[in-house]
Amino acid sequence: MQYEPVIGLEVHAELLTRSKMYCACAVVDSTVAEPNRYVCPVCAGMPGTLPVINQRAIEFALRVALALNCEVAPLNVFARKNYFYPDLPKGYQISQYELPLARNGFVMLATAGGERRVRIRRVHLEEDTGKLFHIDGADGSVPASLVDLNRAGVPLLEIVTEPDITSVAELEAYAKKLRSVLRYLGVSLLRQPIDAGGMLKTFTNHLLLKGLCISGGMAMARQRSNDS
């Protein structure tokens, strides 16, 4: 039996705002900034603190939703996505699920086989987590994990497609199209990972488009060899 690849993409794009999603802490490059310097009781998850939403993040998200031909929801609801991990001090991530910011969009891709329509299932806002640094103790020190919360609370825009992508060429075309849209709108440089999922395979932590396409091609080849 010949199977057809079925791929849906879930993209997390860091928004180019000055402050975090739910507090006034500055958004900085966590790879160079002093650890835990840009943190307040809100993004550190202290009891009794209340979030205040970033208006500019909402405006950026609306730009993207309209550019992707989405239906903007008249009512938005934010929810708590609960999980326990050291880089998420609140014990939950503020995200959207049942009532996202926008739904039912699409983008048109120019491929070798002609134009392809990729449907956008949802566009919603959420916050990033902190960052863990692991020390293996190879130099005789005690193994440990260190937490940097500078990135905790940074605005993220999640863009989810329907499983309409069927080849590596379409995968690359969609990723390039979305990246160009976000950069043209001035809302993101798309530095965050692109995750691809569906019936085929899940790829995570791909900062580079080339890596995403290579992983997609390898997963398809593996599936075909298993089916033969």
Where are these regions (language model features)?
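Basic, nucleic-acid-interacting segments
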Residues: M1-S228
